[in-house]
């Protein structure tokens, strides 16, 4: 069975050669930033019904993200989605899972989430909000803080 992979054109430009090397029996349906579709490089105006979709990080910077997401949710023959998100609790994924669509995610975002958490912990321990308020008021005043070296943390992730 031939498959049609839906992805953003920006992603295709990055990894298209590797995708093409996977199979000769794979049609590529790429959406550009204006929301236009190209099937195997040619403009495509007909209805789309991909069997596979790749929702990479580019999607969350795309001005046509809603159109792409609608194409995914409206695809009657969709069988598999790869997402860049950590969790699958987003409403779009709940509906796909109920339809039996296979959903895969990766841990590619884990380092940036870890950086964010460490930044939040430092902000809390160093009282960044208090420091910024004093700075905005042009007040110099020492701010007490806790050192991290004597602390133990337990971080629980749900994604």
Across the structure, where does each feature detected by a protein language model lie?
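Short gly/ser/thr-rich secondary-structure transition/capping motifs
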Residues: 31-38, 60-65, 134-141
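Short secondary-structure boundary/capping segments
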Residues: 44-45, 93-95, 144-146
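Glycine-rich NAD(P)-binding loop of Rossmann-like domains
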Residues: 131-159
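Active-site-adjacent beta-strand anchor residues
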Residues: 5-9, 82, 155-156
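A short, aliphatic-rich alpha-helical micro-motif
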Residues: 43-48, 72-75, 148
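Phosphate/diphosphate ligand-binding glycine-rich loop within oxidoreductases
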Residues: 51-132
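N-terminal glycine-/charge-rich "phosphate-binding" loop or analogous flexible N-terminal tail
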Residues: 1-59
């Amino acid at each position: 069975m031939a498959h049609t992979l839906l992805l953003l054109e920006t992603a295709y430009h990055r990894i298209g050669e590797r995708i093409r090397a996977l199979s000769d029996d794979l049609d590529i349906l790429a959406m550009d930033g204006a929301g236009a579709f190209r099937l195997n490089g040619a403009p495509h105006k007909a209805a789309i019904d991909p069997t596979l979709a790749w929702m990479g990080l580019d999607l969350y910077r795309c001005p046509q993200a809603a159109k792409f997401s609608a194409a995914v949710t409206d695809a009657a023959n969709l069988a598999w989605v790869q997402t860049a998100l950590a969790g699958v609790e987003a409403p779009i994924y709940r509906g796909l899972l109920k339809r039996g669509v296979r959903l895969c995610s990766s841990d590619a975002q884990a380092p940036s989430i870890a950086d964010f958490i460490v930044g939040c912990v430092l902000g809390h321990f160093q009282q960044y909000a208090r420091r910024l308020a004093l700075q905005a008021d042009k007040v110099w005043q020492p701010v007490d803080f806790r050192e991290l070296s004597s602390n133990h943390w337990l971080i629980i992730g749900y994604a």
